[in-house]
Amino acid sequence: LGEDYAMRLNRDAQVNVLDAALPLLGAGSRIVFVTSHQAHFIETVPTMPEYEAVARSKRAGEDALRARIPELDAVGVGFVVVSGDMIEGTITATLLERVNPGAIASRREAAGKLYNVAEFAAEVARAAVDDIPADHTRYVGDVDDFTRKG
C-alpha cells in the first residue's frame, strides 16, 4: 500500500472526490466530512502512537477541504465536519484495543459515553440537513478532554 497510503486515502482521495463531484452539485448541496476527535484535535492533543499517522492524515484531509469553503460558499454548497469520539463496534476501535488493551474502556470513562455505529450514523445524517455551525464543525460525543488540553 505504500508509506503514504493514509495520506492518499484521507487527504488526496477526499480532495479528488470533491473535485469530481463539485461540478455536479447544485446550490443547497452539502459536503459532510467525517473525522475523529483524535484527528480533529491532533495539532493540540496527542493521541495513541498507533493512531498518530492516521490522525494526522485525516486532519490533513479536513484542512484541505476546509481550505475550499470560500469556493463552496460561492456556489452555494455547504460544508460541515463531523468530529466523533471513538465509536464502539468499529474495526478501528477494535484494532486500537488490540494494540493498546483498555483503550476503549479508558476513553469511555473519560467521555462518559461512547456512541455505537448506529448512533454515530444518525448524527452524520443529521449533519447533512441541520443548520451548519458557524465553525463548520459538528461534535459527536464529549470533547472536554480534548479542549482542556488544547
What are these regions (language model features)?
Residues 1-7, 23, 27-74, 86-90:
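Catalytic loop of short-chain dehydrogenase/reductase
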Residues 89-92, 147-148:
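Short active-site-adjacent structural elements
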Residues 6-7, 39, 96, 112-114:
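Short secondary-structure boundary micro-motifs
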Residues 14:
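Aromatic/hydrophobic pocket-lining residues that form the small-molecule binding cavity
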Residues 1, 93-102:
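Short, flexible, mixed-charge acidic loops at enzyme active sites
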Residues 18-19:
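A short, exposed helix-loop element centered on a Lys and neighboring polar residues
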Residues 75-82, 98-150:
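C-terminal helical subdomain
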